[in-house]
A protein has these predicted regions:
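Small-residue hinge/turn detector
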Residues: 67-78
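Glycosyltransferase-associated regions of secretory-pathway enzymes
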Residues: 1-65, 83-255
Length: 255
């Protein structure tokens, strides 16, 4: 059984922005009786995980939280939420499970922003092993190699019976056009703040969403593709752009 705990990470020590406060208010209103468990930088370092230590030293907060959320669920159990997740309905109906995961909007990858597990879950422990055995590394052109959804996919490859909820349950907001498509089963919205990406990538995401808001979808898709290639070339160079394109092609073939 999953305990009534909401784990979240905040490592910078800065005040919460208004968007985070809004999301946290939804947790308190709609999840009464749940304990909110903050994992700050000091508590994260105390895990002793090499990946966490390296990510904190480089102020890559989101990558530190990838490992910390797994550690929290494996050691204490509960539900992990990114601070840009807005809760719409109670999670009580999920607590009898050993774990729960959902798909990320539009990608068929496991959503890392919302997950839950009972303590000592073998599935969570298997994913956590990656972070325990690897030092932290980060380059924008290789980021897709070790983002949490891909680590989870690798860890769960031998768990064919793992149930994963459809994207509209936890991730109804489109990463592509920014639109939120709610359904009766939707429990929360991951707003994709993308604070972990480089500033140039964040600008590219904003421009792509602007294109989808201004043009018909086929036109926007074409223009967004051109924009993506141009942005990758500017930031990664020719070799990095080709490597990223090959990686995306390989991921597409695996689906």
């Amino acid at each position: 059984m999953i305990p009534k705990k909401i784990h979240y990470c905040w490592f910078s020590g800065e005040d919460y922005p208004e968007s985070v406060l809004k999301c946290m208010d939804s947790w308190k209103r709609l999840l009464p009786g749940y304990e909110l468990v903050l994992w700050d930088a000091g508590k994260a370092r105390a895990t002793g995980i090499p990946w966490v230590r390296g990510a904190l030293e480089r102020r890559r907060w989101a990558f530190a939280s990838d490992a910390v959320r797994l550690y929290a669920l494996e050691s204490e159990g509960g539900i992990y939420l990114d601070t840009d997740v807005e809760v719409l309905k109670s999670f009580d109906g999920l607590l009898e499970r050993d774990y729960f995961f959902g798909y990320e909007n539009g990608s068929k990858r496991i959503e890392g922003a919302v997950m839950g597990a009972a303590p000592n879950s073998p599935a969570i422990a298997k994913a956590l092993d990656f972070y325990k055995s690897h030092p932290f590394r980060y380059r924008e052109d290789t980021v897709d190699d070790f983002v949490l959804p891909n680590i989870l996919a690798q860890a769960f490859v031998d768990l064919p019976d793992l149930e994963i909820f459809p994207e509209h349950v936890f991730s109804p907001k489109s990463y592509i056009d920014g639109k939120i498509r709610l359904q009766p089963e939707t429990l929360c919205v991951h707003h994709f703040a993308s604070s972990w990406r480089a500033p140039c990538v964040q600008r590219g995401i904003a421009r792509r969403q602007w294109l989808y808001a201004k043009f018909p979808r086929p036109v926007a898709c074409c223009l967004a593709g051109i924009l993506s290639v141009w942005m990758n070339f500017q930031n990664l160079g020719l070799a990095g752009t080709l490597k990223k394109a090959c990686g995306m092609l390989g991921h597409s073939r695996k689906k």
